[in-house]
From Swiss-Prot:
Record's keyword annotation contains Cytoplasm: yes
Top class in the EC scheme: transferase
Protein's recorded name: Phosphopantetheine adenylyltransferase
One Pfam family per UniProt: CTP_transf_like
Site (Transition state stabilizer) location in chain: H17
Keyword Oxidoreductase: no
Associated pathway: Cofactor biosynthesis; coenzyme A biosynthesis; CoA from (R)-pantothenate: step 4/5
Subcellular location: Cytoplasm
InterPro entries: Cyt_trans-like (IPR004821), PPAT (IPR001980), Rossmann-like_a/b/a_fold (IPR014729)
Amino acid sequence: MNKFIYPGSFDPVTNGHLDIIERASKICDKLTVAVLINQSKNPLFSIEERVSLLKKVVKGSTNIEIECFSGLLVDFVKEKNANVIIKGLRAVSDFEYELQMALLNKNQAPDIETLFMMSSINYSFLSSSMVKELARHGGNISGLVPECIEKEIIDKFKLK
C-alpha cells in the first residue's frame, strides 16, 4: 500500500493546498495531511481549528485523513508506515528550501522518498500568509480558500 504524507502548518488551508491534496490523493492509496504543531510559531488558528478546517475541506474523500504531529517529520512518516513525503512547490525559492529539507530527511531515513509537486499555475502565487494579510485588511479571499471555510477565516479576524 502506497501511503503518502503531506505536511504543513495549513494556517489556514488555501486552494493551493487543496490542489496538492486532491492531486496527491489520486496517486496513492492513503494520504495523511499532517498538520504541524510548531511551538516556535504563533498560528492564527489553533491546531484543533486547523485540523477541523481541513476535515471540512476533504469531507467525503475516502483515502484522505487529517492528523496533527510534532517533532521530526521522518518519525511521523515511519509511525504511519508511509513511504513518501509530498511537498508542494510554487517557485524556485520554495525548491531551494525544500531540497535541503528533503536531503536532510533522506539522511535521517533513507527509505523515505520526497515527491515534489508543482502547484497549479492558478495558485503559484498563493500562500497562507497572503490570505491572512488580505483577510486582516478586509480584502476578498474568495477563490483563494475553499468556499466551505471562507466565512470561518473572515470571522477569525472579526474577533481580533
